[in-house]
């Protein structure tokens, strides 16, 4: 049940705010949608007490990669399912809309969602209309720089970058030309590229070498699906990182998990992590086809990274302050501050064994689970939607 509360205190929780270095028991007082006080054992003084004892309180979680145009193709899902319904306050659509659909997206998704929704605009005019496996960049006419630039300038408040699928299936006969065009657009508009790697759909297409993709990326650009087992990933046939990957990371290219239905493989993840290449962000690549598994939600994806060796503090940092950096939104997201609108997630850390499943049905024994308890935006305290998590 969602509650509208004018004056309330989150009482007794462990606050982890990586942006300010806070980690300890702290109460948070919210009045009229703004954080008014943070401190140990605050007095209620007439405020409604929301008991979060034995819970982890964080800045609002940010899921930086989803497909959120409900009813569009095979993927589109209501943003509030992976958003406030999963303890997450900000979600980012990864290219459902090209320039031609962006106004529709804004009117019917962004404005109607209870969750904050941001966008990567698709390089292709088609966006996500066709669904996966189609050559949405194979015809040069499917990229219209002038209209993309106009759409971005009109929607700067929600656009965080340009999405491009760098696979043989998507690029088709155009080869690497769309990447060159995306690079120029990103430079002109001063926004990053979000690049999908891994040929997970069109098995007949020749894979694009990740080294060729990385030639077009600069500091602040993002590679998503860093743990994919599909052709075009970060590892060579011997399980070693391609040298271009290390160079790109050292030069500021960012790496995102992008779990998805196909692109988190535990064996690949272990090999990548063993070579000291770590994710900058954690995301679900959530859509209609993976809510019931293997993805479930962002807290479950964070818990899978914990099973791979990351600490609670590290995954919280990835999903808050690091996510805000990926999006270029550090002035408004990823922290809790007095005087700022309440944007808060509450999770329960459960010490129990459960079987984590990757995108290829590989399993791993996990010993800690993260379960959403609340997502708080301004005056509203949202409870999570029911879902059968592992």
Please annotate each region the language model reported.
Residues 104, 143-255, 263-280:
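Histidine/acidic residue-rich metal-binding segments in metalloenzymes
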Residues 86-92, 96-97, 112-140, 163-170:
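Metal-cofactor-binding active-site regions of metalloenzymes
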Residues 44, 52-112:
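Metal-associated gating/positioning segment near the N- to mid-region
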Residues 341-390:
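C-terminal cap of metal-dependent C-N hydrolases
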Residues 268-349:
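His/Asp/Glu-enriched, well-ordered alpha-helical/loop segment
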Residues 1-9, 13-58:
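Histidine-rich, glycine-flanked metal-binding segment
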Residues 13, 28, 33, 54, ...:
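Divalent metal-coordination and catalytic microenvironments
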Residues 60-66, 91-93, 117-121, 160-163, ...:
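Hydrophobic faces of well-ordered beta-strands that scaffold small-molecule active sites
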């Amino acid at each position: 049940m969602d509650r509208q509360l004018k004056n309330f205190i989150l009482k007794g929780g462990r606050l982890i705010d990586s942006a300010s270095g806070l980690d300890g028991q702290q109460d948070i007082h919210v009045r009229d949608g703004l954080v008014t006080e943070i401190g140990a054992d605050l007095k209620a003084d007439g405020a409604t007490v929301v008991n979060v004892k034995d819970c982890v309180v964080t800045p609002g979680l940010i899921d930086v990669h989803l497909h959120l145009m409900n009813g569009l193709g095979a993927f589109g899902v209501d943003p509030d399912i992976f958003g406030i319904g999963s303890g997450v306050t900000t979600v980012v659509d990864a290219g459902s809309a090209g320039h031609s659909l962006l106004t529709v997206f804004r009117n019917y998704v962004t404005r109607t969602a209870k969750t904050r929704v941001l966008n990567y605009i698709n390089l292709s005019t088609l966006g996500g209309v066709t669904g996966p496996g189609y050559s949405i960049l194979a015809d040069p006419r499917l990229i219209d720089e002038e209209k993309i630039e106009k759409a971005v300038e009109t929607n700067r408040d929600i656009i965080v970058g340009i999405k491009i699928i760098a696979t043989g299936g998507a690029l088709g006969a155009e080869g690497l030309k769309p990447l060159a065009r995306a690079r120029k657009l990103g430079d002109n508009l001063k926004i990053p590229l979000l690049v999908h790697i891994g040929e997970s759909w069109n098995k007949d297409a020749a894979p694009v070498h990740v080294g060729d993709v990385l030639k077009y990326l600069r500091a602040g650009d993002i590679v998503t699906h860093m743990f994919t087992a599909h052709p075009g990933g970060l590892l060579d046939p011997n399980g070693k990182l391609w040298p271009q990957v290390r160079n790109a990371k050292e030069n500021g290219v960012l790496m995102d998990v992008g779990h998805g239905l196909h692109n988190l493989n535990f064996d690949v993840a272990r090999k990548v992590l063993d070579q000291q290449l770590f994710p900058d962000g954690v995301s679900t690549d959530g859509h209609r086809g993976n809510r019931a598994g293997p993805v479930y939600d962002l807290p479950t994806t964070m818990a899978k990274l914990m099973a791979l060796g990351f600490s609670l503090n590290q995954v919280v940092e990835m999903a808050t302050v690091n996510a805000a950096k990926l999006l270029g939104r550090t002035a408004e997201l990823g922290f809790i501050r007095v005087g700022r609108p309440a944007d808060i997630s509450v999770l329960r850390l459960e010490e129990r064994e459960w079987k984590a499943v990757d995108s290829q049905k590989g399993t791993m024994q996990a010993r800690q689970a993260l379960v959403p308890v609340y997502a708080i935006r301004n005056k509203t305290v949202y409870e999570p939607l029911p879902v059968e998590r592992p």
